[in-house]
Amino acid sequence: VQQLQSQFPQFKINDLSPILDGMRLIKSKEEIALIRKATQIAGLAIIEAMKSTAPGVYEYQLDAVAKYIFHVNGSRGDGYASIIGGGTNAFMGHYFHKTDVLKPGDLVLMDYAPDYHYYTSDVTRIWPVNGKFDPAQKELYNYIETYRNALFKYIKPGVTSDEVLDKAAADMEAYLVGKTFAKPHYLKAVQE
């Protein structure tokens, strides 16, 4: 913006964020249908990635499977950069490298959705490389599901995202007591 202003000082530049933000808040029936279709395609892609998961498969190969499903279902491509991580990469937040091989005993996290007529969704799933959750993985999966439900409980008009996060975190404190992944050595690994 500053570069444009310096090149064209005779023009006034206005911040359209308030107008655009307002437009993003309310969706037409047609827009909602496009978002739903993007979500359905994301679901199909993740299911195919799950079916393709096995020890020895690379993270980028799951990306390719999902991208293929996007395209054969009418998508132009990615709605955003894919997050696909196995093992410790699944817990690195926004992990984009997709270069590691999946190993037995690992979990895979995929956060990915298509661009469908300029609309997307946000779908994240986690599953075991072996195809079946072991007890510790199941415990972690149940925690994630419980936390998601706690978040949804507080999402309401007028409640800020920080308030939602704070209330859900407070709900989850008691849930964490005694959980395997809440032990100090796991928490230290997450912080590192």
Which residues fall in each region the model found?
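Active-site neighborhoods and metal-handling regions in enzymes and metal-associated proteins
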Residues: 1-192
